[in-house]
């Protein structure tokens, strides 16, 4: 960092599912002559997450940064994304290390709100943190909403998410297959009934099998007459004929890689 020529540094949480244009946040940062800009979102009424919240002035200045036991409807939830001037970040890290501090948010930023010009930039799109099996399951289920899917996987080249390409034949639906509200990847063969589920490539669903509210990863085979509901199957799993597996929204049943059940 000392040898770099960049004026600004972007720190972003690795467990946040979000598609954000940081150019707009950078414009906000410059417009307010900020030392630090924290990106936040208004908490929706059904948000089960925990984390830091921001108390803001009417001019978007951060007055307080704290971590309540639970988040409430309308709280300003910090998304773990920070724009900061490089020199200020470097000075803050060196100072906190010398004083024995280890947490940049709680130990450094939260105690520097009067010394630094810290502002909050509101993000109004989809943003969810994956911190548990439950939240992983819920974020995947959110993709079944076309509005969420289009926002996260935006076809606009400036916002597009690039992934590894793996060409396969199109999914094949047999005569008795029934599919509703699913994301089904190439290479899948569907002979049974699938609802509200996500299927990775080359999944096979047998005759009269029923899969609901589940995440089925690649190369999984689901036998004839099997029943799955609220299940997460890792790749290369084999679910035998007439097997019945189920979980709940809060506790989806997880099947390990290469398991045979």
Residue ranges and their predicted role:
Residues 1-141, 255:
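Unchanged
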Residues 87, 95-261:
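Left-handed beta-helix
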